Amino acid sequence: WDWSTAGDDEREEATHEYLKIKGSFVYEKNLKPEFVWYNGHADRYLLGDPVAEEGITALNPPKGDIRDPEAKIWPFKVHRAMQPYDTENRYLMQPVTAGEGGFWREFNWDQAIQLGSEVTGMDYSGEFGFAATSMYWPQTHMVAPKEQALQCKACHCERGCIDWEAIGYPGDPLKWGSRNRIHREDLAGAGEQR
């Protein structure tokens, strides 16, 4: 969802692609989730926290990694967006969208951000841009019935649905061994036939 494209009078509206009040967005069907380690806890972006200097500001990154014995591999849908932020103070801003002076009436980001700063009590330098953000949504609803659950080979095959290297394995753990073995041996000899 790209708020930076909102307010464009020249762009044609399309319900699932662009709305003047919201900007552009992409809907996907049968979206393949992203798999990450998750121990049931997450960090949270709090109003006033700095945005990432480079890259993406994660609003609620799941906690856990391959070395965390409490963590399990979880599927997440990751919502990516471009959101307004104060370029001098380097934090996300909460614009007023509805009502008098709101963005949806005036289509003026500077004014909407200024009004939002008055509501939140945050300083606004008068300089804004749009920062890349991500929000992790655990896939715990709208999940297929158990009869349609993935079988082992959906992940443990050459083109499986999990990117093993992205979550800390040197390859498929069926070949390389469990996370305990991998870290116990510090990857020395992992994956070799014994």
What are these regions (language model features)?
Residues 1-150, 157-194:
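Primarily the internal scaffold of c-type cytochrome electron-transfer domains
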